[in-house]
C-alpha cells in the first residue's frame, strides 16, 4: 500500500505519522518533493512548500517510515536540482529512493511549451550522471518491459567506520548479466538465483519494503557483500518514470481491456 501525498498533514501531525508507521512493512509514503527553490514550487505547486516538505521528512525520519521522494521535472525549472535532491535523499534515514517523473502534458498544465520545457527520460538520465558522483551510466538500467518509459538503479547504503558509503548494485553484478541472461562471473554456482532476485528487484511492481526478502536472498548470493547486518533500510532506488501524453503517446503500450484504463491513457 502506498500513500501519495503532498506531506502537509504529515508535517503538522506527528501522531498521524506514528499511526501510518504502524502499517509497515507493507506500506510506504510517496512524497511530492520537486524542488528546494521557492520560485519553482510556486510555479509547479502554487505555494512555497519548502518548510512543509522538510518538516514532513523530519517526522517520517522519527519513525523510519519508508518514503519515496517524487520529483516532477520540467526543463528550465528544476532539472539542475537533480543531484542536490539525490544527495539530500541519501542522507535521510526514512528515504528509500527517488522517483523522477518528467512533466506529463495533461490536466492543469497551461501554456506549456513542449519545445523548451518537456524533458525526456534520456535527458533525466544524463542529468543524474552529470550531477551525482555516485552513479555511472552502467548503474542506470532501462527496464526491459518498457525501456522508453522506465529506467532504474539500485544502491546499497553500506555502513563504514566513518559513516556510510553508497555503492550501486552494479558494482557486484553487471547490467549485462541482469538483462541478457548471461551467466554470472561472480558466483557461478548461484547465477540463476542472482538473476532471479535482481529481476524481481528491478520490477516496478516491487516496493522497496516488499523487496526485503529478495534483497536478503541476493546478499547471500554475493560473497563480496557482508549482508548479515544489512536490511531493506540499506537499499536505495532511483526510478525515472515517463508517463505518456499526447506528444509521446504509444498506442501499443495501453491495455485493450475496457475495464482497466491505465492513467496515461485516461489523462491523454
Where are the regions that the model predicts?
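Generic structural "secondary-structure junction" signal
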Residues: 12, 105-108, 251, 256
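C-terminal target-recognition/interaction regions appended to catalytic cores
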Residues: 215-268
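Low-complexity, compositionally biased segments
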Residues: 37, 51, 149-151, 245-254
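Radical SAM enzyme [4Fe-4S]-AdoMet core and its adjacent flexible, acidic
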Residues: 44, 62-238
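Radical SAM/AdoMet-radical enzyme domain recognition
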Residues: 1-102
Amino acid at each position: 500500500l502506498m500513500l501519495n501525498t503532498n506531506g502537509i498533514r504529515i508535517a503538522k501531525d506527528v501522531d498521524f505519522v506514528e499511526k501510518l508507521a504502524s502499517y509497515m512493512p507493507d506500506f510506504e509514503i510517496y512524497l511530492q518533493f520537486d524542488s528546494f527553490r521557492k520560485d519553482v514550487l510556486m510555479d509547479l505547486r502554487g505555494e512555497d512548500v519548502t518548510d512543509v516538505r522538510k518538516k514532513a521528512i523530519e517526522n517520517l525520519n522519527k519513525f523510519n517510515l519508508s518514503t519515496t521522494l517524487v520529483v516532477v521535472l520540467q526543463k528550465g525549472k528544476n532539472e539542475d536540482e537533480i543531484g542536490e535532491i539525490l544527495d539530500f535523499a541519501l542522507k535521510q534515514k526514512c528515504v528509500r529512493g527517488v522517483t523522477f517523473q518528467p512533466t506529463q502534458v495533461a490536466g492543469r498544465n497551461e501554456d506549456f511549451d513542449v519545445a523548451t520545457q518537456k524533458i525526456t527520460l534520456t535527458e533525466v538520465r544524463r542529468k543524474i550522471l552529470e550531477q551525482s558522483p555516485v552513479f555511472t551510466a552502467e548503474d542506470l538500467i532501462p527496464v526491459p518491459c518498457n525501456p522508453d518509459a522506465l529506467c532504474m538503479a539500485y544502491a546499497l547504503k553500506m555502513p563504514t567506520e566513518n559513516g556510510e558509503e553508497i555503492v550501486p548494485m552494479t558494482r557486484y553484478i553487471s547490467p549485462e548479466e541482469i538483462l541478457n541472461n548471461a551467466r554470472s562471473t561472480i558466483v557461478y554456482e548461484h547465477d540463476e538465483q542472482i538473476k532471479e532476485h535482481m529481476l524481481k528487484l528491478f520490477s516496478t511492481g516491487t516496493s522497496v519494503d516488499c523487496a526485503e526478502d529478495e534483497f536478503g536472498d541476493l546478499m547471500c548470493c554475493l560473497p563480496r557483500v557482508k549482508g548479515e547486518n544489512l536490511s531493506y533500510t540499506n537499499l536505495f532506488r532511483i526510478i525515472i518514470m515517463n508517463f505518456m501524453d499526447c506528444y509521446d503517446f504509444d498506442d501499443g503500450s495501453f491495455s485493450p481491456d475496457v475495464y482497466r484504463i491505465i492513467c496515461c491513457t485516461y489523462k491523454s
